Amino acid sequence: MTTYNAAALSDIDMLVKMMQEFYAIDGYPIDAEKSKKLFEQFIKDENLGKAWLILSDEKTVGYVILTFVFNFEYGGKIAFVDELYLSEDARGKGIGTKTIEFIKKESEKLSLKLLYLEVEDHNSAAQKLYLSSGFVFHNRLTMKLKFE
């Protein structure tokens, strides 16, 4: 059975360990100490978003994070699916689909107007999951401007 627990301060070390595994997939750099501080800030301030541990048969197998944004185009608060990670042994078992359904229900409870996300070009399994869950490709390009 798949269940979800709201992330707590006591979960930060486990979350960062999973985040390191997630980032390693695509070779993204990660500063574990900085990530721990960011998780602490995030968990303490519910206005920033929500994070959940994903459990399968009471074993933690991943996490999902929604970050909140106010958006005029969509009429209010929306969320970015900032991260959705499942351990390798949890993939392909329907847990991702259940997790998307869970965050859709949570989004309704939170009166969110829209969910959006990014997915790697090469991650066809994730793209298939998101498309089958009702997400569509957006006809705009994503750009960024990073501040140090």
Region annotations inferred by a language model:
Residues 6-10, 17-76, 106, 137-138, ...:
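Acetyl-CoA-dependent GNAT
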Residues 7, 84-86, 119:
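Hydrophobic adenine-recognition pocket in adenosine-nucleotide-binding enzymes
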Residues 69, 87, 91, 120:
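Residue-level recognition of the GNAT/N-acetyltransferase active site
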Residues 77-88:
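Conserved acetyl-CoA binding element of GNAT-fold acetyltransferases
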Residues 86, 92-105, 131-132:
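Conserved acetyl-CoA-binding loop-helix of GNAT-fold acetyltransferases
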Residues 100, 107-118:
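Conserved GNAT acetyl-CoA-binding A-motif
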Residues 113-126, 144-148:
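Conserved beta-strand-loop-alpha-helix junction that forms the acyl-donor binding cleft
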